[in-house]
Amino acid sequence: MCSSDLPAPVTALLSGVLAKAGAYGLLRFAILLLPDAAHRFAPILIALGLVAVIYAAIIALAQTDMKQVIAWSSYSHMGIVAVGLFTLNAEGIDGALFQMLAHGIVIAGLFFSLGMLALRTGTRELAGFGGAANTMPKLALLAMLFAMAGIG
């Protein structure tokens, strides 16, 4: 079962909390317990993180289902976290931790607001949300605020 098949609260939990467990595991175990290995493989993992950022963003642009757009955008943001962690300096790790916190809040809000929009419009397709601001101005504003927060 893919994340787009799950209900909005489950998807929000998976993306908002559980995806960060892997990044926390990298920080706690790979970097702190195995610093020599982290230094040795840091350039490779930074390159993989950059590939994830670019590739997932391109895939997100090609989607028409908003849940897929948000999911691929989430993968891209986790690539930013990986790059920050494997810079192996205080600024990069602090930035990665801040990105994890911000991403968890924003992505959960995006999935919840998308769930409410999809419930009211009957679709998750991007084209089906036209005119949502006219019929549901507060919900559209909330969704737009989370979307803008996700952009940066």
Description of each model-found segment:
Residues 4-152:
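Hydrophobic transmembrane alpha-helices and their helix-loop junctions in integral membrane proteins
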